[in-house]
A protein has these predicted regions:
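PLD-like (HKD) phosphodiesterase/transphosphatidyltransferase domain
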Residues: 1-73
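Acidic, low-complexity intrinsically disordered regions
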Residues: 15, 87, 96-101, 146, ...
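Short catalytic/ligand-binding loop motif for oxyanion handling, primarily in non-cytosolic enzymes
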Residues: 27-29, 77-80, 138
Length: 178
């Protein structure tokens, strides 16, 4: 798998970057302290890596690029997914549109099991970065493609995910109401 500068692709996106998350747990060593704090009910410490990502989102949104994400979750929500819901607030504060879709409620989401970021699908230079994870949820590699068939497949997955996603704030309110 070739090296892919994912943050660089966000920086150069002109119209849209769409992230689909399908994993129920991501093993990201850099998140360990934040996750531990969340699990213990303490405030999550700042993380320079997250701060850098949020700055990239703010800059993209400021130049008119739409940044969106949908996480397809399974019920019951595990502790990691509850952590993600809390951590996403930082993303929305930076201007990213975050949606949540429940796989059990929408059978057509069952086939969506591969993470990716789709860049500028309607633009002159569309591309998709497929994100490969191992069984533990660790990122195993990134694969970039600008092949029309790959972009079209990712765009169809994006449409399915967006059709069933609920905005983060609405989902959290519904989840808290029980």
């Amino acid at each position: 798998m070739a090296d892919v500068d994912l943050l660089g692709k966000y920086r150069s996106a002109a119209e849209e970057a769409f992230r689909l998350e399908t994993q129920q747990r991501y093993a990201v060593p850099a998140e360990d302290e934040q996750f531990r704090a969340f699990a213990e009910g303490r405030p999550m410490p700042s993380d320079p890596r997250v701060d850098r990502s949020m700055q990239i989102i703010r800059e993209a949104v400021a130049r008119g690029c739409r940044i969106r994400r949908v996480h397809i979750m399974d019920l019951p929500l595990n502790l990691y997914l509850r952590y993600e819901l809390a951590a996403y607030q930082e993303n929305t504060d930076a201007g990213e549109e975050v949606g949540i879709a429940l796989r059990r409620w929408h059978p057509d989401l069952a086939e969506l099991a591969e993470d990716f970021v789709l860049f500028d699908p309607e633009g002159p230079h569309p591309g998709v970065v497929w994100m490969r994870y191992d069984d533990r949820g660790q990122l195993a590699g990134l694969v970039h493609s600008d092949k029309p068939a790959d972009v079209a497949l990712a765009a169809s997955y994006r449409q399915a995910a967006l059709a069933h996603a609920v905005p983060l704030g609405e989902f959290v309110t519904l989840a808290e109401a029980g």
